[in-house]
Curated annotation (Swiss-Prot):
Induction entry: Following incompatible or compatible interaction with pathogenic bacteria, but not by wounding or salicylic acid. The induction is localized and does not seem to result from a systemic response. Induction occurs more rapidly with an incompatible interaction.
GO cellular component: vacuole
Organism of derivation: Brassica campestris
Protein name: Glucan endo-1,3-beta-glucosidase
GO biological process, one term: carbohydrate metabolic process
Active site feature: 119, 261
Compartments, record wording: Vacuole
Length: 342
């Protein structure tokens, strides 16, 4: 038969390689707006274009930013703020209005995901409303003819336990019960789970060496997972694969993970410096574009936190580093260190 021709199979394999989505690992950047000297949104979008940053995450609707994104071709994650969850869960009409005003109205913006909530924790106000809010937003998007926009939520490493070795990863009991319906929703909709992963905190807490946290080679923390013989050369991969293991144990083994935040501060804490931030961001950029993790050897969609330093983020004198995650100075609009985004 013709289909069994070696030459035809070879040509088909070339065609598949040509059409493979090579953009999956391209780096995006989170645009937070908590600072009191952040440039206006039109300037920020112009900077994304100037530096060829292909993706943006923003933590809530901002009409000026959404208007500036029109026609920009920047792929976009828009968050539903945690404070809106209960209102949107209680009323399908409210969810419809939210989608109409913040998504449907901007039909020339490349919405990719709607993240319903960011790092929602069990017992917090609105936590019980999370899954219903996700369902209502999803229904509103479908009714508006926008079912190509995926609905998800953003979690973090806090729900995970037994992350060493990664194959033992699982969710803490209180989070497993909380996340189970979310995971079921994501599996049904074939949407990814968004996860914030920061290797900096492992270094700050003295759990791992600086090299291992910065994705630098020949760290004394490198190890082989005894349960599957996968080799781990950096802390980022170990974190990510522990999430995949936890998802497998919770019925979410088919899910992809989007790393919705990762970064390194430039001052204010142990190991927080411009050279270390430069090393981390560049090592991460190369890694997620080429290698994937030992468990999932494919490009990893990743967003760097953050575009700018955000002075009001400090929560206590011990958290000075929280103000200094930005890659750009908000006053000079210049990069603090060298990095390419594509």
């Amino acid at each position: 038969m013709l289909a069994s021709s070696p030459m035809l199979l070879f040509l088909l394999s070339l065609l598949m390689a040509y059409n493979f989505d090579t953009t999956a690992g391209q780096i995006g950047v989170c645009f937070g707006q908590m600072g009191n000297n952040i440039p206006n949104p039109s300037e920020v979008v112009a900077m994304f274009k100037q530096y060829s940053i292909p993706r943006m995450r923003m933590y809530g609707p901002n009409p000026d930013a959404l208007n500036a994104l029109r026609g920009s071709n920047i792929e976009f994650i828009l968050d539903v703020p945690n404070g809106d969850l209960k209102r949107l869960a209680d009323s399908q009409a409210e969810a419809n209005t939210w989608v109409r005003d913040n998504v449907q109205k901007y039909n020339d913006v490349r919405f990719k995901y709607i993240s319903v909530g960011n790092e929602v924790k069990p017992g917090e106000p609105g936590a019980a409303a999370l899954i219903q809010a996700m369902q209502n937003i999803d229904r509103a998007l479908s009714a508006a003819g926008l079912s190509n926009i995926k609905v998800s939520t953003t979690t973090f490493m806090g729900p995970s336990r037994n992350t060493y070795p990664p194959s033992r990863g699982r969710f803490k009991d209180e989070y497993r019960n909380f996340l189970q319906p979310v995971i079921g929703f994501l599996v049904n909709k074939r949407s990814p789970l968004l996860v914030n992963i920061y290797t900096y905190f492992g270094y700050m807490n003295r759990d791992v060496s600086l090299q291992f946290a910065l994705l630098q080679p020949n760290s004394n923390n490198e190890f082989t997972d005894p349960n599957n013989q996968l080799r781990y050369l950096n802390f980022f991969d170990a974190n990510l694969d522990s999430v995949y293991a936890a998802l497998e144990k919770s019925g979410g083994g088919s899910l992809d993970v989007v790393v919705s935040e990762s970064g390194w501060p430039t001052q204010g804490g142990p190991g927080a410096s411009v050279p270390n931030a430069e090393a981390y961001v560049n090592n991460l950029r190369l890694h997620v574009n080429k290698n994937g993790s030992p468990k999932r050897q494919e490009a990893i969609e990743t967003y760097i936190f953050a575009m700018f330093d955000e002075a009001p983020r400090q929560t206590s004198p011990n958290d000075e580093y929280e103000k200094y995650w930005g890659m750009f100075s908000p006053t000079t609009r210049q990069l603090k260190y060298g990095v390419k985004f594509n």
